[in-house]
Amino acid sequence: MANKKDFILDTAQKLFMEQGFDQTSISQILEATQIARGTLYYYFSSKEEIMDAIIERTIERAFTASQAFADNRGLTIIERLVGSMAALNLNHQEGEGVLLHLNQPQNALLHEKTNQILLERAPQILLPIIQDGITAGDMRTDYPYESLEMILTYSLQAFGSSFQALPPEKQQQKLQAFLYLLETIFHSRQGYFNPFLSLIQTQSS
């Protein structure tokens, strides 16, 4: 039964990405899946509920991938940190469809809920990396968890769709300011967080 539910989600997500959420109908999902209408409604009461489930699944996959980077002791501390944060990028996890839906004005509450989940769970994944950085002498802070919360909150706001609209020189200025912020909060050497440059630029492209 679970496999059929995932099949519906996979098929619907493909259609949403190809055609757009508003342009995709339940009838088209039924035609693509070749399942009975009653079967689909057994799992989902509406197209919106299907998208909610896709978003929830996307978030869970992002957390799983992020945790894998955090736990990989074969990587350097900064590689684990950058990899873990890159994995939390929902756009790269599932393509543009999910974020395009979240960014619609009518979905503001859903977007806020998604960000809240990220802000609640991501620091728990990233905290051991920061603690390893402190132990290694690469970072220093009395407030590692709170620092992560503030950095993640700022990142969600600063490097979203509004960042893409900035001219290149303004983007670079904001990126350099973010690196300065990281180095200041964690009392790290200059250049330590430079790998974040490519991460943010990739996420925002």
Regions found by a protein language model. Give the residues of each.
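Hydrophobic alpha-helical connector segments
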Residues: 53, 67-98, 151
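Hydrophobic recognition helices of helix-based DNA-binding modules
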Residues: 58, 62, 66, 92, ...
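Hydrophobic/aromatic residues within well-ordered alpha-helical segments
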Residues: 47, 58, 62, 84, ...
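C-terminal peripheral helix-coil segments that are non-catalytic and often amphipathic
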Residues: 124, 128-132, 136, 161, ...
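All-alpha amphipathic helical-bundle segments outside canonical DNA-binding/catalytic cores
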Residues: 79, 114-118, 131, 135-151, ...
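Short secondary-structure transition hinges
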Residues: 93-127, 135-138
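Helix-turn-helix
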Residues: 7, 15-49, 53-57
